[in-house]
């Protein structure tokens, strides 16, 4: 059985970890970084860039560079959040798919589902793991925000499938962080608050870590959050301030210039990071735009105090879910023994200060906020693979689940913060005399009114024998698996007839859609390989042309005019071939140049060897002088000093 890798698929950055023996290890990507930007770009040449390479070219390719895709995953286009919070904040096109989902489109009109874009990031993670392990990787544990609903969880599983990964478990991010902390800590019973403020989402989980018969039992008592609160919002607040200040100075609104907007966005993110350690920073963007009077430059000084005033409402927004999580767990602030900070945005001093004020204790600084979630996912992978024996994880469902009943009311079968996996049944009946069928409308949320909650799906139980209203007994069963994904069945107790629905297409993608996307991903992998091979052939050709011409120059009169002409002709033909996309032609002309140059190289080598032999013979006659020999001191260098 291969390794089950752990992936933190983040809004802004993603991270990969694996179990290395008994410990989880974060794996660096091909660029040598421990986290990878969750950015995917489609270039004019048809190449797909992922991570740092995609982020670097975002300024010049804003329409086709997709970031913060996690905020769209599993969402409908008409969602208030999509219309208000996303469409206005990104330079790329967000469109309505045929099934009503929020999709994205390139400027060339290629439409893509968010899981399809996220799959590119997962493919890079998969490749990183395979390069490190030297073997194929097909299984993963992927983390999601604790407050993700069923559709968002399913869409994340779909992204894994498109990337060629079987998602063995979907695990909540704060739970994963507690797992990373809990496995390392051997301090007996603890009640831990995990405050997770990432790039796009915020979660708070209250978790109990206990030693039960020598096993680390990690039980989630409650969870709460906001799927539209994260570092991206902090960047945006600073970006809007910079644009407003520039408008005051120059009278030009940069909101309408996509290129300038992307430059300001990047500068805002950089300034935000700098202000976590410095009291002030300069945002300097020369030639940001131009008008009739000439080019304009943006140069604005931002102090930490100014930035904190811009985002203080965002930080305060995170404290309300903290109150609710404590209430749901039936605990007070004094019951919390440790506070863990997770997510890059928790590096901001104001966040740390407000969390300390709220819980009345100093948050721990020994947990890496960028890596803890991936480490926890890898540990869960180790548990599932049987490599980690002494850990028991008890997670919860973040939102209540139920069905619509008479009068448009939601009747809850499973309350929020119920430990999963779980199964619950309840008997319902008909609303009319001789009603032949009932529609089971499955809902997720906390509101009394059915229409105010998230609809997960509908199905009908038909052929109910004629009977007065209230007589037939329809047993509805909700079954949630360990991923937090739901199965619902309805059974007529009189006839035994049963109908069920696996809430699996609530991500909006059918099996056929996913299969097509898997094939597209494989085709892209093939195209990427062809592109890579073509570039390699061109590089080989360029090196050969350079070395051949240099050698001819160095050999001078030792090469005849006819030989020089033959080599130059072969070089020119190869140069012409490298300008095409025909790999075979490049390789054929490369071979032709190699063959043309081979006799010259042999002749030069023979002459060189002959000259060296003659020189060596002359030197052999000279006696060696003893004083030329020096004794050197050698020192053993231990591995840890290397």
From Swiss-Prot:
Record has rRNA-binding as a keyword: no
Induction: By stress conditions e.g. heat shock.
Modification sites for Phosphothreonine: 201
Keyword terms: ATP-binding, Chaperone, Nucleotide-binding, Phosphoprotein, Stress response
Region annotation (Disordered) ranges: 609-642
Top-level taxon of the source organism: Bacteria
Keyword Transit peptide annotated: no
Gene Ontology molecular function: any one: unfolded protein binding
Compositional bias (Acidic residues): 628-642
Function of the molecule: Acts as a chaperone.
NCBIfam families: PRK00290.1, PRK05183.1, prok_dnaK
Similarity comment: Belongs to the heat shock protein 70 family.
Record-given protein name: Chaperone protein DnaK
Species of provenance: Francisella tularensis subsp. novicida (strain U112)
Gene responsible for this protein: dnaK
């Amino acid at each position: 059985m291969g390794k089950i890798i752990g992936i933190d698929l983040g809004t802004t950055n993603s991270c990969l970890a694996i179990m290395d023996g008994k410990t989880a290890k974060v794996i660096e990507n091909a660029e040598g970084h421990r986290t990878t930007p969750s950015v995917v770009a489609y270039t004019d040449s048809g190449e797909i860039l992922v991570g740092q390479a995609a982020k670097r070219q975002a300024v010049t390719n804003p329409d086709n560079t997709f970031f913060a895709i996690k905020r769209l995953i599993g969402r409908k286009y008409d969602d208030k959040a999509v219309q208000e919070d996303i469409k206005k904040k990104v330079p790329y096109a967000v469109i309505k798919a045929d099934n009503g989902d929020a999709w994205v489109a390139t400027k060339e009109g290629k439409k893509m589902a968010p899981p399809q874009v996220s799959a590119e990031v997962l493919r890079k993670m998969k490749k990183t793991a395979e390069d490190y392990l030297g073997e194929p990787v097909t299984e993963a544990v992927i983390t999601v925000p604790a407050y993700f609903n069923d559709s968002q969880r399913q869409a994340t599983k779909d992204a894994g499938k498109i990337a060629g990964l079987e998602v063995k478990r979907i695990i909540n991010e704060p739970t994963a962080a507690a797992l990373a902390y809990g496995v390392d800590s051997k301090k007996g019973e603890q009640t831990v608050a995990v405050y997770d403020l990432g790039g796009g989402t915020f979660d708070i989980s209250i978790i109990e870590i206990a030693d039960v018969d020598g096993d680390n039992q990690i039980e989630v008592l409650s969870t709460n959050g906001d799927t539209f609160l994260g570092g991206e919002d902090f960047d945006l607040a600073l970006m809007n301030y910079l644009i407003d200040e520039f408008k005051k100075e120059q009278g030009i609104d940069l909101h309408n210039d996509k290129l300038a907007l992307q430059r300001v966005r990047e500068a805002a993110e950089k300034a935000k990071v700098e202000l976590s350690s410095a009291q002030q920073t300069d945002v300097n963007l020369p030639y940001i735009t131009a008008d009739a009077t000439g080019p304009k430059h943006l140069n604005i000084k931002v102090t930490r105090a100014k930035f904190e005033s811009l985002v203080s409402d965002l930080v305060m927004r995170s404290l309300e879910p903290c109150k609710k999580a404590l209430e749901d767990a039936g605990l007070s602030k004094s019951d919390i023994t440790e506070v863990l900070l997770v997510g890059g945005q928790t590096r901001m001093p104001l966040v740390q200060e407000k969390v300390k004020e709220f819980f009345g204790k100093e948050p721990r600084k020994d947990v890496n906020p960028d890596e803890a979630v991936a480490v926890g996912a890898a540990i869960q992978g180790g548990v599932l693979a049987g490599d980690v024996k002494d850990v028991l994880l008890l997670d919860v469902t973040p939102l209540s689940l139920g069905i619509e009943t008479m009068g448009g009311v939601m009747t809850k079968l499973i309350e929020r913060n119920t430990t999963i996996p779980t199964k619950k049944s309840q008997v319902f009946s008909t609303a009319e005399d001789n009603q032949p069928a009932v529609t089971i409308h499955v809902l997720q949320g906390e509101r009394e009114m059915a229409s105010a909650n998230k609809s997960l799906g509908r199905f009908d139980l038909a052929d109910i024998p004629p009977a007065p209203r209230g007589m037939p007994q329809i047993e509805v069963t909700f079954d949630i698996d360990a991923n937090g994904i739901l199965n619902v069945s309805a059974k007529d107790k009189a006839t035994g007839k049963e109908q069920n629905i696996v809430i699996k297409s609530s991500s909006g993608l059918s099996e056929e859609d996913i299969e097509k996307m898997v094939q597209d991903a494989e085709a892209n992998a093939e195209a990427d390989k062809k592109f890579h091979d073509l570039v390699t052939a061109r590089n080989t050709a360029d090196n050969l042309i350079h070395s051949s011409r240099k050698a001819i120059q160095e050999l001078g009169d030792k090469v005849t005019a006819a030989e020089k002409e033959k080599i130059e002709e072969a070089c020119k033909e190869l140069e012409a071939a490298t300008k095409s996309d025909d790999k075979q032609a490049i390789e054929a002309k490369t071979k032709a140049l190699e063959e043309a140059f081979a006799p010259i190289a042999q002749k030069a080598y023979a002459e060189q060897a002959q000259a060296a032999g003659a020189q060596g013979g002359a030197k052999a006659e000279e006696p060696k002088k003893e004083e030329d020999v020096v004794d050197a001191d050698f020192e053993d260098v231990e591995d840890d000093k290397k």
